[in-house]
Amino acid sequence: MKVSRHTKILEIINLKDIETQEELAEELRRSGMEVTQATVSRDIKELKLIKVLSSKGRYKYATISPTESFLSNKLVTIFAQTVLNVDRVNNMVVVKTISGSANAAAEAIDSLNLDGIAGSIAGDNTIFILSRSEETAFNIVQKLKKMINE
């Protein structure tokens, strides 16, 4: 069941610009599959789908190439090895790294395509991430801390 659902998801996102999990769930239902938004969310994670800018200027789900996946995994490893601390101040996330590593760690964060990030800036050993809300900042901190096993 899961394999056929994953295959159908990949087929759908290659044929249509799917912007939300709910849209994807609706397309799956139209093809005769009973799914919940939670199931679709898990499938998106397992398939490592990302959101990319479509030709219409809107974000849609897409797959990443094996090269991008390999590079992304390398960056996540660098992130885990160089980050010392992750903290939140209101809607801003502050990431402290070992000296000279902030740019590489910021590249890793960018490769994650996390929702709700308005922008980021990296210095020598500090990254500032501006999120769209305090709740989003909290969620980003949780995800980043999980990556460094904190």
From Swiss-Prot:
Keyword Cell inner membrane: no
Chief subcellular location: cytoplasm
KW Transcription regulation (keyword) present: yes
InterPro entries: Arg_repress, Arg_repress_C, Arg_repress_C_sf, Arg_repress_DNA-bd, WH-like_DNA-bd_sf, WH_DNA-bd_sf
GO biological process: L-arginine biosynthetic process; protein complex oligomerization; regulation of arginine biosynthetic process
Pathway participation: Amino-acid biosynthesis; L-arginine biosynthesis [regulation]
GO molecular-function term, one example from the UniProt record: DNA-binding transcription factor activity
Superkingdom of the source species: Bacteria
Alphabetical UniProt keywords: Amino-acid biosynthesis, Arginine biosynthesis, Cytoplasm, DNA-binding, Repressor, Transcription, Transcription regulation
Family the entry assigns: Belongs to the ArgR family.
Protein name: Arginine repressor
Organism listed in the record: Clostridium acetobutylicum (strain ATCC 824 / DSM 792 / JCM 1419 / IAM 19013 / LMG 5710 / NBRC 13948 / NRRL B-527 / VKM B-1787 / 2291 / W)
Gene name tied to this protein: argR
